[in-house]
């Protein structure tokens, strides 16, 4: 191992790498594009294996200035005392460390099949090792957009997606999902693939809309978006039955009205009973039906009735329990065939906010990204982000 002090350990580098204190995240950020974002990559692990394209790993304890250089793969484990972290058998006193894939913050570091710029932070928690990617917000977008939209799509659609994703991420920085991270890398927030998904057209879309966000009162809103709405988008309040204050307006969607995405799937009744934790001995006889729909045709609640009891479940919760890949949206009808429930529907996703296929259609028909965003987020503004940390 070789110890050395990196010359760029100054406030700017700290901000760029996300090595700021919690107090630092509340200070005014002069350069919005350098705002550090904390993306959850994994948690609850007993061991983590990290590599880099340069075959070098730089490691730093959170409360130290010195970085340790390792060659090749590093294996991170929990110490026998359960209070510290070890790397390749070397004990580190801290319960949290930073890792980078080279001397520059842009050098990618590898975990599993993903490559990530910025830094990785590994924290020892009661549940195991938790790992986040600390990365400047605009750099995050380079590796995030392809996870949600095809880079070959119309440029104005890509720009609309960039602004929506940037706004969502900035909102989550201010309203983090967890004390240790702002958002997750999967469909629970925004799909983030990392550096290997970067593309020239994505970088153009990011740079040409730099700092632009969807706002209300000069603050970023929570910009939901989805694949296909099926003809109309839906109010967030109706979908999640909560006090969601943004995305409360349903709008017609031209593309989905003309080219609806049709799907169908079948689920055994006992599978639904199982996820709802209803005893299987109470399975028969049963009746399952749509309790009510919204004005746009989306199912709000499902009613399940047996001789013993009655249940109702929010349709979006049911999608989550049965799998989003199975029940693709809440725009569906039900049919019972003996002990099998058949779903037949249209659209894909929760239906709230921007419809991505609708955005593509609008872009193909000459609409700008600002016009696209104004259609799906009516009554909100598109403006340059104002520092609000």
Segments the model singles out, each with a brief description of its role:
Residues 1-389:
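Conserved, single-site charged/polar hotspot
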């Amino acid at each position: 191992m070789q110890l050395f002090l990196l010359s760029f350990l100054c406030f700017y580098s700290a901000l760029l790498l996300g090595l700021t204190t919690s107090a630092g995240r509340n200070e005014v950020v002069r350069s919005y594009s350098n705002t550090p974002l904390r993306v959850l990559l994994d948690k609850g692990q007993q061991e983590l294996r990290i590599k880099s394209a340069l075959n070098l790993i730089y490691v730093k304890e959170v409360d130290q200035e010195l970085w340790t250089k390792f060659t090749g793969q590093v294996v991170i484990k929990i110490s026998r005392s359960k209070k510290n972290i070890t790397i390749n058998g070397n004990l580190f006193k801290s319960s949290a460390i930073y890792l980078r894939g080279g001397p520059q913050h842009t050098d990618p570091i590898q975990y599993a099949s993903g490559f990530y710029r910025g830094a990785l932070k590994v924290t020892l928690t009661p549940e195991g090792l938790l790992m986040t990617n600390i990365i400047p917000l605009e750099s995050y977008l380079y590796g995030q957009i392809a996870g949600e939209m095809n880079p070959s799509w119309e440029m104005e659609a890509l720009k609309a997606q960039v602004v929506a994703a940037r706004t969502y991420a900035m909102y989550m920085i201010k309203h983090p999902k967890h004390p240790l991270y702002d958002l997750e890398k999967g469909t629970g927030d925004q799909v983030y693939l990392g550096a290997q998904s970067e593309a020239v057209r994505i970088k153009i879309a990011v740079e040409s809309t730099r700092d632009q966000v969807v706002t209300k009162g000069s603050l970023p809103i929570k910009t939901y978006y989805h694949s296909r709405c099926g003809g109309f988008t839906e109010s967030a309040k109706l979908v999640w039955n909560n006090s969601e204050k943004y995305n409360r307006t349903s709008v017609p969607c031209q593309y989905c009205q003309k080219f609806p995405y049709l799907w169908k799937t079948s689920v055994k009744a006992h599978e639904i009973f199982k996820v709802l934790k209803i005893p299987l001995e109470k399975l028969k006889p049963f009746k399952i039906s749509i309790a009510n729909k919204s004005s746009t045709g989306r199912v709000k609640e499902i009613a399940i009735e047996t001789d013993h009891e009655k249940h109702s479940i929010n349709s979006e919760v049911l999608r989550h329990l049965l799998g989003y890949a199975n029940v693709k949206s809440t725009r569906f009808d039900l049919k019972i065939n003996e002990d099998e429930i058949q779903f037949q529907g249209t659209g894909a996703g929760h239906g709230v906010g921007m419809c991505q296929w609708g955005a593509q259609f609008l872009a193909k028909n000459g609409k700008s990204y600002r016009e696209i965003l104004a259609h799906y987020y009516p009554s909100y503004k598109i403006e340059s982000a104002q520092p609000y940390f």
